[in-house]
C-alpha cells in the first residue's frame, strides 16, 4: 500500500472512530428534555414565576386584613380568626430549582430513586426559583410564619435547611418550620395532615405549590378525579392557592398510566400518547 493510501486510510479510520465516540457520548433521548430546558433556561419561565410571587404579595396583604381568610378550608376549623398568620409553601420546584438533578437523570439515562435524590439534596446545589426568596422574606417581615411543607424525606432536613439558609430563606426562629415527609408516622406524601398541624396554631393565609398534591390530597387519582378536585378548588385558585408551572414532573405525568410505577418506560409513554387529543391533519 502506498504512503498516500495509508494516510487516507488512517484519516478515514480516525474520523469513523471519532464519530462512534461522539455517538456514544451523546445523551439518550428523553421525554424530559424540552420541559427541563424551559425551566432551567427560558426567560419566559422566570417571568411566570415572578408573576406568581408578585401576586402572592398582593394576596398576602389582602389576607392579613380579612380575618376570615384561610387557605386551608379542609383543615382550618373553629375560631381561627385570631390565630397568628402563616403561609404554607412547597419547596421543590416552588422555592427551589432542582433542574440539575433532572439533567443528571437525562444524561445518565437514570430514573428517579430516593438514593440518588438524597445524594443530590446533600450536595446542596439547588437554586432559588425567581421571586421565591423575596416573597418569603416579605411574608416574614409582615410577621407571617413561613412553613415549608415538603415531600423531601426527614433524613434530608439538615441539608435542605442549610441550602435554603444560604439562599436567604427565613428559617422560622425557634419554631421548626420545615415539615418533612415521614417526620412523623402520619406525615405521608399527602400533605393534609401537615396542613392540619399548622392550622392548629396558625391561620393559613396562602398555600403555594407546583402540584395538585400541594393543595388537595386527591392528587394521585385518575385524570377524571383530578379534574373534579381541581374544579372543587375553583374558589381558591389565584386567591388563597397559587400554582407555579412545573412541566418536568408531577402527578399530571403519572396519572395517564394510573400512577403504576412498575410499568416500563415504553408502557408509560404509550399511556400518555393514548390520552392526548390530536388534530386529524389537513384534508386530502
Predicted regions and their residues:
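Substrate-recognition element of Asp-dependent hydrolases with the DxDx(T/V) motif
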Residues: 93, 123, 132-165, 212
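Non-catalytic pre-domain segments flanking phosphatase-related domains
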Residues: 21-89, 258-261, 265-266, 270-284
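Second-shell loop/turn segments in exported
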Residues: 38-49, 118-126, 147-153, 183-184
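C-terminal cap/substrate-recognition subdomain and adjoining C-terminal extension
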Residues: 54, 153, 157-284
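Bacterial N-terminal signal peptides that target proteins for export
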Residues: 1-8
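Active-site neighborhood of HAD-like aspartate-dependent phosphohydrolases
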Residues: 84-86, 95-130, 134, 141
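Surface-exposed patches in mature extracellular/periplasmic domains of secreted proteins
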Residues: 64-76, 146-151, 173-176
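Bacterial N-terminal signal peptides
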Residues: 9-17
